[in-house]
C-alpha cells in the first residue's frame, strides 16, 4: 500500500500549536514583539514534535467507526482491547512483556510526568535528568516544588552524545535524589541508549534508591537498522522502573491525549489509582487501539521517508553550511544541529530564525542547559517543506554573518 507523505496539508484554523500557538510557548506572554521579515502566513512550522502528515487510516477508520455510536459519555480503559493491542505491539517489536494490571492510562506522557513526581517525591526532594533535556522534565519537577538537578552529557567532535557516568554517579548518589527522568530514545539528541548504558544507569539508580521514569515516547521512530530496548526489559519485575509510551509520536495522534504507563510496583500503582483521573476520551481510546492493531505498515513506510529526510538534511548542511555539526540521530524525527561556529552566545536562535528566515524552530536554550547555539528541527514534514526550510535557514545565516 502506498502512502503520500509528500502531501502538503494546511493546519491553519485548526487551533494547531504548531502554527497558531508557538509565540507564547517559545517566548512567553511578556516577550518583546516579533520583528518578522515576512508575512505571518509564510512562516514554516518546524518546531513542536508532532508531524505534518495525515494520521494513519488505521486510527482514522477506528474513529470513524466509533462515531457511528451516538453516545460519548464518560469512558475509561475497562476492557482488554487496549492492553491486547499495545502488549502485542511491544511483544512483536521489542520482545517485552508486562501484566495487564501494570498498564495504566494517562492523558498523555506530560500529565504522567507531573503525577509521578508528586507520587514518588516529597516536597524538597530532587529529580535528576540528563541535559540537554526535554523542557517538561524540568517543569514537572519545579511546578511540584521539587528541586531539578542535571547531569550534562558529553558531545564528541562528530556530534554523538554520551553519558558522563562519573558525574551521573555523583548526582544519583545524593540521598535527596529520589527520581530520575530518562528520555529513551533521547530528545533532542536522538540517541538510543545501548543495553550497557541502560544497565549502568539502572543499576546506579536502583542501588541508590532512585526510581526511574523511562520516557520512551520516541521508541518506534528508529532509523533503519537500529533497535530499541525498553529499560524495563533489562530489569524484569523491578518495582523501580516506570515506563511511559504513547501513540502520539508514533502515529501523529498527540492531540488525542492518551498514553500508557507501565507501573510494576504495586504500592505506587495503588497510589496512582487512588489519585489519578481515570477517564479517557472515547475517540482517543479507539484511535490508540486501531493504530496499534493495524498501523504497522504505515509506520514502516513513514520511517523510510524520515530516513530520506535525514539524508537530505545531512547532504544540504554538508554542501551549504559546512561549519555546522550534524549527526543523523539514531531515533526520533528531530534533527539536533550544532551552529556554534556561526553564532555567539548573544543570539537567541529561536527568535533569530523566526524573524530572519520565517522558520519556527527551537533553539538549544529551550532544552534546560547544555544546548547553547544549537537548534532542534522537526523533520516529520513533506520533503518540499523541509527543503524550503533548510534554504531559508542557510540564507539567513549567510545574509547575517557572511
What function would you assign to each model-found segment?
Residues 144, 207-208, 357, 400:
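Helix C-cap/helix->beta junction micro-motif
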Residues 4, 10-108, 115, 293-294, ...:
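N-terminal small-domain helix-loop-helix segment of the aminotransferase-like
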Residues 71-203, 220-224, 228-234, 238, ...:
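Conserved core of the PLP fold type I
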Residues 306-314, 326-339:
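Conserved glycine-rich beta-strand-loop-beta hairpin in the small C-terminal domain of fold type I
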